[in-house]
């Protein structure tokens, strides 16, 4: 299993623009055979922070997700609003592969 959290600090006022596109990307991603979970959350402590929690059956399934045109377009769109970006792999001790 390949599970991770992405935390994105955004330029002020960018959150709504990203959320407008995020729902469609979420729908498409959840339909991928290798996707186990694809969720995003607004941060209650910081209105300019967006958090994604994603889980794929494998690192390869995530790589395939990254090759999808809708994924590339969504990333290219929201990157222009980044102030910070953190990617953290998460899991239990027995999921370190």
Q: For the regions a protein language model found, what residue spans apply to each?
A:
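Short, glycine- and small/hydrophobic-rich beta-strand elements in well-ordered beta-sheets
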Residues: 26-48
């Amino acid at each position: 299993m390949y599970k991770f959290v992405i935390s994105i600090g955004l330029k002020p006022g960018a959150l709504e623009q990203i959320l407008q596109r995020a729902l469609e990307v979420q729908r498409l991603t959840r339909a991928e055979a290798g996707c186990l979970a694809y969720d995003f959350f607004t941060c209650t402590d910081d209105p300019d922070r967006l958090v994604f929690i994603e889980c794929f059956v494998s690192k390869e399934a995530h790589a395939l997700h990254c090759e999808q045109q809708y994924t590339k377009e969504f990333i290219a769109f929201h990157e222009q609003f980044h102030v910070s970006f953190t990617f953290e792999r998460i899991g239990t001790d027995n999921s370190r592969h």
